[in-house]
Amino acid sequence: MISRTIGESIPPNTKHAVSVCLPTWEATVGYEEGESSIINSLTTGYPRFFIHKSIKKLCEILSAKYSMEDEACLCFPSYKVANRCREFIKVKTGLSTKVRILQLCTPKPMNQEEKLWRRECKITVVFVDQEIFPVMKQYWQHSGEIVSSRMAEYILHELQVKDNLKKMETVDNGKKFMTEDENRVNEEYIETRFGRNLNFLAADKAKYLIRKRIATKVVEKIDSEGLSDLFSFEHYNESNGPFNVGSGEALDDDQLNSDIPAETITSMGESGSNSTFENTATDDLKFHVNPNTDVYLFPSGMASIFTAHRLLLNFDAKRLSRSSSRQDKLIGYGPPFKKTVMFGFPYTDTLSILRKFNHTHFLGQGDSTSMNALKNILHSGEQILAVFIEAPSNPLLKMGDLQELKRLSDLYSFYIVVDETVGGFVNIDVLPYADIVCSSLTKIFSGDSNVIAGSLVLNPRGKIYEFARKFMKTEDGYEDCLWCEDALCLERNSRDFVERTIKVNTNTDILLKRVLLPQVGKLFKKIYYPSLTSEDTKRNYDSVMSTKDGGYGGLFSLTFFNIEEAKKFFNNLELCKGPSLGTNFTLACPYAIIAHYQELDEVAQYGVETNLVRVSVGLENSDVLCNVFQRAIEKALGE
């Protein structure tokens, strides 16, 4: 089912959707310009940009109860996250800025039965003057350390239960009223105990399975006592129809059926804690990744990148403490901390992290020009902390030379952080060339566009590995802020991520060769795709492509000779249209408009043209998909 109404969720009627329908070029511009008719139509949005209605409702309740005059609030998943947010606010607005922090938690389960559907949920609420709220929202967006919509719904439900119990306690006369309140509490119990179909006790096992899939790129069969009995599901496959991705609610946590076979786990719990798994790199680069000590899960992909950046800054702080009597406890935010390097034109919030939480060299071309610029920086004697790079980049699908970066890293003692969200675990093996690999699990790993999460993998052979392991165990290091229901949903969605990735690779190859490549020089000025962007990109990508099942992925970008043809093409695409990528259904957006509307001239210097349309290919029937693009081409050309 295609979302066609401005502001509805993608997929339609999906409570926890991570994309929103902006079906025309004009609607996307209207969204960026803040047109009230567009903004008021939004039912959802990408979670770091659009505060979900459940989170808004929770904040309104807490604000009504705890805020002071002219204060606004936002919820965060832990006190440590809230404290980092407070630090960011004070750095950006001044030390005198008033920031209040309130810690809250829901009740713990009282017995073994309650553990099936109840979990103590701790959140921290940050209160600031309303005029400071946009700065706090920046932290939420850039850091990705957020409260999920499922977590907010759980807290709202617990608040409702508590409220009903309190009402019952306050009624001390009138049997009629007491009976009504008792009935309400009984109804709440039944809804909570039997209405929730996710077993909270399985959350830790679900997280282990996710980490293991990331470590091994293999989905193993779930044993008879595992998660396969907890829920079934149906997500996109060809039998659902060429563009039918379900009715909406079925993509959430309700009754779902699957013809994807469950798979078996041979080691769990205590036995799994010491297990390691072989990465499928080339023979001379083989090493083992332990899913329990080398793989970490986060509430978003940006949170994993933000944590990698924090880890590196804390490492640099050790250098500074040894070399000076520095009293300032502030970590990052510019000198005397070393600069990082952003290699290539990245997703917007990655660059924001490097700029707003420290300082950075932005080498936006991401090619030999940028490599020469990096070498000039290194040859000048400047010591850099780390190079951040996407593999490949979004939206230009450029691939930097990871082998050369690794050589320079060893020579000049800097670290490499790779975001391989676009390439994906199945298609590329970048860990041998990186110290840290980050990824958004919201994308192809999940596919169903109904949960947000991220991962960070430490290279056991990396130069910073020992420090990183220790840092992750410190008070300021790693916290597991991935809510249990999100983990259960992600585990379910990712059971077939390998097969889906292979199918997407095939669909994209067919679409490009059969329909789009013949239009280069006619309608399209250029197609950006790892095998097409440039000879250097193809060579660099091929050097890290997985030997088993690897392909070029499902993301490509199109540029046009004139913007009117771009608008006609986009408006006539009979597809879901909105932000995000890696969905099981094909998704398109005018990327420069939606991501860089306030800086179109600046990003054009790096090749991100205003007319650029980004497409993320899904699992639809390839013939149907080709016909959809062919019709849009004909409309754009006036045929």
UniProtKB/Swiss-Prot annotation:
Keywords: Amino-acid biosynthesis, Cytoplasm, Methionine biosynthesis, Nucleus, Pyridoxal phosphate, Transferase. PROSITE patterns: CYS_MET_METAB_PP. The modification N6-(pyridoxal phosphate)lysine is found at K443. One of its GO terms (molecular function) is pyridoxal phosphate binding. Its cofactor is pyridoxal 5'-phosphate. InterPro entries: Cys/Met-Metab_PyrdxlP-dep_enz, Cys_met_metab_PP, PyrdxlP-dep_Trfase, PyrdxlP-dep_Trfase_major, PyrdxlP-dep_Trfase_small, Trans-sulfuration_enzymes. GO terms for biological process: methionine biosynthetic process; sulfur compound metabolic process; transsulfuration. The keyword Amino-acid biosynthesis applies. It is found in: Cytoplasm; Nucleus. Disruption phenotype: Leads to a clear growth defect on medium containing cysteine or glutathione as sole sulfur source. Its EC number is 2.5.1.48. Catalyzes the formation of L-cystathionine from O-succinyl-L-homoserine (OSHS) and L-cysteine, via a gamma-replacement reaction. In the absence of thiol, catalyzes gamma-elimination to form 2-oxobutanoate, succinate and ammonia. Present with 2070 molecules/cell in log phase SD medium. This is Cystathionine gamma-synthase. It comes from Saccharomyces cerevisiae (strain ATCC 204508 / S288c).
